[in-house]
Amino acid sequence: IAEDIYDLTNLPKKGNPFTYDAFLAAGENNNAKLIAAYFNQNGLEAKYIHPKDAGIFVTSEPCNARILPSSYDKIEELRNHNEILVIPGFFGITKEGQVCTFSRGGSDITGSIIAAGVKADLYENFTDVNGIFAAHPGIIKNPHSIPELTYKEMRELAYAGFSVLHDEALVPAYRGKIPLVIKNTNNPNHPGTRIVLEHSNDHVTVVAVSYTHLRAHETD
């Protein structure tokens, strides 16, 4: 880790649009190494895997990278591992070998990409709330968490201002037809919100209400 941090100081300060991304990605990358080491020290067989080795190759768009479709064949090979795999989120590698970060919520995007690549049965995304609330808790007192949403409803809410999960993080899991569950790291026994292709209950009417600049958005 110390060597990696030192290497950052040798990157060109001017003329390289990827230098900023390399610094942004360093924290996530080094945390993944520490977590893998912690697991191993506590008797859990774990392995740190760099995004390059995982096959997460992206477009050359600093701070706005997008996964290359050809990456998924390599990512699927992660299924061959038996260890706990610790893969840093938030960034991928360009074909030229440059670190390039995803947009805001990039770690969620990485999780969704990997879930789609390995054809996971479920993608669990842990955050600091009990799923998606039916209304903004800063405006409505004690709103209930929504047990189930469709991907379409979740994208509409994300676009309208619900910021628990970046809307771009929904796309890989949706295309892979993988259910996604948003759960609370500090309350893991709470069921959270499950995001699916279609509702199991056909009688759902209003799901949630949000607003942007005094314009109301209602999903059904």
Predicted regions and their residues:
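Charge-rich, low-complexity amphipathic helices
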Residues: 60-62, 137-138, 176, 180, ...
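Conserved small/polar residues in nucleotide/adenosyl-binding loops
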Residues: 212-220
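Active-site proximal loops enriched in glycine and acidic residues that flank catalytic Cys/His/Asp
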Residues: 127, 184, 218
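Self-splicing inteins and homing endonuclease
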Residues: 56-63, 187-203
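A conserved active-site cap/scaffold subdomain adjacent to cofactor or substrate pockets
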Residues: 158, 166-194
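Nucleotide/pyrophosphate-binding catalytic subdomain
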Residues: 1-170
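Flexible hinge/switch segments at interdomain interfaces of large molecular machines
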Residues: 205-211
